[in-house]
């Protein structure tokens, strides 16, 4: 009583406290970073190693395995995967959430150093690592085009200057440059000319390496001067290499230009990049796992004027893709939704109270509570994102509830003729415990979320804390500022009989009278209501089992990502043509704004594409509808497939799969994996619940298998090392020397000129110089025959792995897809040597599915404990919790009606309903208990009176929560696919709960009261006087 009086009778202090809360909130709002979702990225580090010319199997056994054994000992590694392809190995380390990325990076470097002695010689550089997830979509893509500069020169400028500058920007984790490779001097040998001159490929290699050296020469000095010695020991251009003498034949000099074409070219000619229809160099920028995407993009944009200033006029730098506009638009939509919710909630209050002064009170209380929450969000290190702003939108209905309960009770006393200050004090005292009970029990709902681990726990933590803080501030405001404003702003008045006969007042009176009549009938037919109550419990269970489920709603971010997978024996020239054909099909689609792509590198038969769609307001279709339309057109392209998926703000795992979801097969036997993977992939491709089924297992690449005759080799004076060196020199794009320049280092690359390697007959032209100096053709000691070979070898941990990726057809949920896959795996009878499990997002979905029911039960149990403590009763909390089944039925039916699967966002809605609908029961039970204690009423009379007396505030709070959630349902702008499931769940649950709990709660109250009396009689014993 004194606590409430302290604030009611000291209005200046109360107003200043509210002003301080508001000012702190405004400051916090200005300092809060902006993001699409809470920070939920796993710490990921990518280790790269290369050995030019080495086969995928050689890379896997000699490079990947030693590194994996060393890296696998690092603490906190959640998952380790690797992919080895021609001359390249990439290992992805995904760490636990609580692992510091910088500490993990130090451990990774130490593990690489430990494995260095086990790695093969000939590697051009030590393995390196980057703190970025290669499977994440770039946050920004820049393109460089030029009419006069070559692609190699553009690539050099991009990687040497632009990428270095961009990588220094805060938040940037990796800048991947694609579309070409660094400049190089390429030596294309003529095998027939070499044979005629009796020059081996090793001799050419050694001559070039010896002619291009960079060694310190020292200095000469006398008593007065010092001269630095400088020589022309380096050759830097193709023109300088051509006259190089590599051999003497009968005293005549054989120069490099006599046996080879020497050109200024690039290190790897099998690379191509395009933007729209133009050749381009792509700078794909990815952020650090812990970085904020908006701040990072803003930092890059702020740097662009400086970058453009350093670019020559012949180069055009453009932003091909930027993830931030759709994120900003989505957040703006949420902010507008929040403003609409506040306005609708205040309108509900006005319609019920029909007083401008009375409406002004919650109109002040709601913004103070919401704005004050921003200060706590800043102190907690949160961001303004879709989930935290959705929490505030939903909180609008909650925070006004507290003010409504206090305000309505004070207004009731004023209408009875009590003086304003006395009414404020008395009204607040009466409902103070009720408000505290409602708020604490609502906060209790979110305690299990705060303790939830893994990605879902990280994702929901900001939502739970933000909402809990808003409720806490609202509780303080409703017990301090609200009664003070009521006491000083409202006036005593007689019951507004005339006003109640008009408009909303007349409707409320009619509803209340009708409710009273129907409630009397219900209380006389309690068994029927009990059957209805039990029916809702059973219906909840059936609906939860039957409803389709998914992890997270499919987002329309306006960005698509596509992976090209061509025939495994395709040439680079043909693959480049496929890239151009696919880009043309996509560019012609009316919803597409921009398309960039590249192909080449270690996987000739693959490529990547990034598509930016037009803004949501400029296209009629969603991103998924655009994909469905393009899928039909792209399927007509022979010899290759393009798998498109919408970029999501949440992507789990480090695998660069060609679809959104993955199912991984593991085996200790590579042969067993290669036998069963095609069978499983074929069976899964036939499932209607899956689309775009593809696999990263590519073991049908064309290979030419050479079989050495070792006896003949020994007789001819040839060893295996010389033969292998011949093949590497001829066909491996071997980097044989380094050219040092002020800004970078470039390579001299040697191979047989591509003009002489157009078919297998090129092997017949190869020869080895034996120990006697004679040229021995390769065909003398080797036979060759075509075979199949893997284009890549993949590991997970230390086991051979193959990942089958898939998308979902429109109208199919992830739960339906996973059930179909599990059923198919059982039917196929896969042997124990091959193990299958979901990975990435599908794996997290499975884990979340297993914990959802536990989470809901934990929330209910927590609320029960809190209510039990507050009421000092085992029974009354059960009465209050009896409101939940009807809300659950309403929520699940609404999701079915809107064809929305049960997702993590819908789970949040269910958790919120646990907190919302019990408020009705709390108000009924509180007043019924008070009427029994102080009024001497029977339980039947008490609960009947409580229901009628609290009908108006129950309607007000329910409608306020409903109208607060309604804008989430009706939103259709950017990010609406995230907001709608939450709104649908809450609105559906509130409507059903309001229809049923007004009747079931009184019946349950009486049932437990009679049960309590029955047990108390049985346990009662006669008092014995001593």
Curated annotation (Swiss-Prot):
Coiled-coil parts of chain: none
UniProt xrefs under InterPro entries: AcrB_DN_DC_subdom, Acrflvin-R, Multidrug-R_MdtC
Cellular component aspect of the GO annotation: plasma membrane
Topology in the lipid bilayer: Multi-pass membrane protein
Keywords: Cell inner membrane, Cell membrane, Membrane, Transmembrane, Transmembrane helix, Transport
Spans through the membrane: 15-35, 333-353, 360-380, 387-407, 431-451, 463-483, 528-548, 853-873, 897-917, 953-973, 984-1004
Official protein name in the record: Multidrug resistance protein MdtC
Organism: Salmonella paratyphi B (strain ATCC BAA-1250 / SPB7)
Gene symbol of the encoding locus: mdtC
């Amino acid at each position: 009583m004194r606590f409430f009086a302290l604030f009611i009778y000291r209005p200046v202090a109360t107003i200043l406290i509210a002003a301080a809360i508001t000012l702190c909130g405004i400051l916090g709002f200005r300092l809060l970073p902006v993001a699409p979702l809470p920070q939920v990225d796993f710490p990921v580090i990518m280790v790269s190693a290369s050995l030019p010319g080495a086969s995928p199997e050689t890379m896997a056994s000699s490079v990947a395995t030693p590194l994996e054994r060393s890296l696998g000992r690092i603490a906190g590694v959640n998952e380790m995967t690797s992919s080895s392809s021609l001359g390249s190995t990439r290992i992805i380390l995904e760490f636990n959430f609580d692992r510091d990325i910088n500490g993990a990076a130090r451990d990774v470097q130490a593990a690489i150093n430990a494995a260095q002695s086990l790695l093969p010689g000939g590697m051009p550089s030590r393995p390196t690592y980057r703190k970025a997830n290669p499977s994440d979509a770039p946050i920004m893509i820049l393109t460089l085009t030029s009419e006069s500069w070559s692609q190699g020169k553009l690539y050099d400028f991009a990687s040497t200057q632009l990428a270095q500058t961009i990588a220094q920007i805060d938040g940037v984790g990796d800048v991947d440059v694609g579309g070409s490779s660094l400049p190089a001097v390429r030596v294309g040998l003529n095998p027939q000319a070499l044979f005629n001159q009796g020059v081996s490929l090793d001799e050419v290699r050694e001559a070039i390496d010896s002619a291009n050296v960079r060694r310190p020469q020292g200095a000469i000095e006398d008593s007065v001067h010092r001269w630095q010695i400088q020589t022309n020991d380096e050759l830097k251009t193709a023109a300088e290499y051509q006259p190089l003498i590599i051999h003497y034949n009968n005293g005549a000099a054989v120069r490099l230009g006599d046996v080879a074409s020497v050109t200024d070219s690039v290190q790897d000619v099998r690379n191509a990049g395009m933007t729209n229809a133009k050749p381009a160099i792509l700078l794909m920028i990815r952020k650090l796992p812990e970085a904020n995407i908006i701040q990072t993009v803003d930092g890059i944009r702020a740097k662009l004027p400086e970058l453009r200033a350093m670019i020559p006029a012949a180069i055009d730098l453009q932003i091909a893709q930027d993830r931030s506009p759709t994120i900003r638009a989505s957040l703006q939509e949420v902010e507008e939704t929040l403003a609409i919710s506040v306005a609708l909630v205040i309108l509900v209050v006005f319609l019920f109270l029909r007083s401008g002064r009375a409406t002004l009170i919650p109109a002040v209380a709601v913004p103070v509570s919401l704005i004050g929450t921003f200060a706590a969000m800043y102190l907690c290190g949160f961001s303004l994102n879709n989930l935290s702003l959705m929490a505030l939108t939903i909180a609008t209905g909650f925070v006004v509830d507290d003010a409504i309960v206090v305000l309505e009770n004070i207004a009731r006393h004023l209408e009875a003729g009590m003086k304003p200050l006395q009414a404020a004090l008395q009204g607040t005292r009466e409902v103070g415990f009720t408000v505290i009970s409602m708020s604490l029990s609502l906060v209790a709902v979110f305690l299990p979320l705060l303790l939830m681990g893994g990605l879902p726990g990280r994702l929901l933590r900001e939502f739970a804390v933000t909402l809990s803080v808003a409720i806490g501030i609202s509780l303080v405001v409703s017990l301090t500022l609200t009664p003070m404003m009521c006491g000083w702003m409202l006036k005593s008045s007689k019951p507004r009989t005339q006003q109640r006969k008009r408009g909303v007042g007349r409707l409320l009176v009619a509803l209340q009278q009708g409710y009273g009549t129907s409630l009397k009938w219900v209380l006389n037919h309690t068994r029927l209501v009990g059957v209805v109550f039990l029916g809702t419990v059973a219906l909840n269970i059936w609906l939860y089992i039957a409803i389709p489920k998914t992890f997270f709603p499919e987002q329309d971010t306006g960005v698509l990502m596509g992976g090209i997978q061509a025939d495994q024996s395709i040439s680079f020239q043909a693959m480049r043509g496929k890239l151009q054909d696919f880009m043309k099909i996509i560019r012609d689609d009316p919803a597409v704004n921009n398309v960039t792509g590249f192909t080449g590198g270690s996987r000739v038969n693959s490529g990547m594409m990034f598509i930016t769609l037009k803004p949501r307001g400029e296209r009629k279709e969603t991103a998924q509808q655009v994909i469905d339309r393009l899928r039909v057109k792209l399927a007509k392209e022979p010899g290759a497939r393009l798998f498109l998926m919408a970029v999501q703000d949440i992507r789990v795992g480090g695998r660069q799969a060609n679809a959104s979801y993955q199912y991984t097969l593991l085996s200790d036997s590579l042969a067993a994996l290669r036998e069963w993977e095609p069978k499983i992939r074929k069976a899964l491709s036939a499932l209607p619940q899956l689309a775009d089924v593809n696999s990263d297992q590519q073991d049908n690449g064309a290979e030419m298998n050479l079989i050495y005759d070792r006896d003949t080799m020994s007789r001819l004076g040839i060893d295996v090392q010389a033969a292998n060196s011949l093949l590497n020199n001829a066909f491996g794009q071997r980097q044989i020397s380094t050219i040092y320049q002020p800004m970078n280092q470039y390579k001299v690359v040697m191979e047989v000129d591509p003009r002489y390697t157009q078919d297998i007959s090129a092997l017949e032209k190869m020869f080895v110089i034996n120990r006697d100096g004679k040229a021995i053709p390769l065909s003398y000691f080797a036979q060759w025959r075509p075979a199949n070979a893997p284009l890549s070898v993949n590991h997970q941990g230390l086991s051979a792995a193959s990942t089958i990726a898939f998308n979902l057809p429109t109208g199919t949920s992830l739960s339906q897809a996973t059930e179909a896959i599990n059923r198919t795996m059982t039917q196929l009878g896969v042997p124990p040597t091959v193990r299958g499990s979901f990975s990435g997002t599908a794996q997290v979905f499975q884990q979340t599915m297993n914990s959802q029911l536990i989470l809901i039960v934990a929330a209910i149990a927590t609320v029960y404990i809190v209510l039990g403590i507050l009421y000092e009763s085992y029974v009354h909390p059960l009465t209050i919790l009896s409101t939940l089944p009807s809300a659950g039925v309403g929520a699940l039916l609404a999701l079915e009606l809107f064809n929305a699967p049960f997702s993590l966002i819908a789970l949040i809605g269910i958790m919120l309903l646990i907190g919302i609908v019990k408020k009705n029961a709390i108000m009924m039970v509180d007043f019924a208990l008070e009427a029994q204690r102080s009024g001497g009423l029977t339980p039947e009379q008490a609960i009947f009176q409580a229901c009628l007396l609290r009908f108006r505030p129950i309607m007000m709070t329910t409608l306020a929560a409903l109208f607060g959630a309604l804008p989430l349902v009706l939103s259709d702008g950017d990010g609406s696919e995230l907001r709608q499931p939450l709104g649908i769940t809450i609105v559906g649950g509130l409507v059903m709960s309001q229809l049923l709990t007004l009747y079931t709660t009184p019946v349950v109250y009486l049932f437990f009261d009679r049960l309590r009396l029955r047990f108390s009689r049985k346990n009662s014993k006669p008092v014995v006087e001593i």
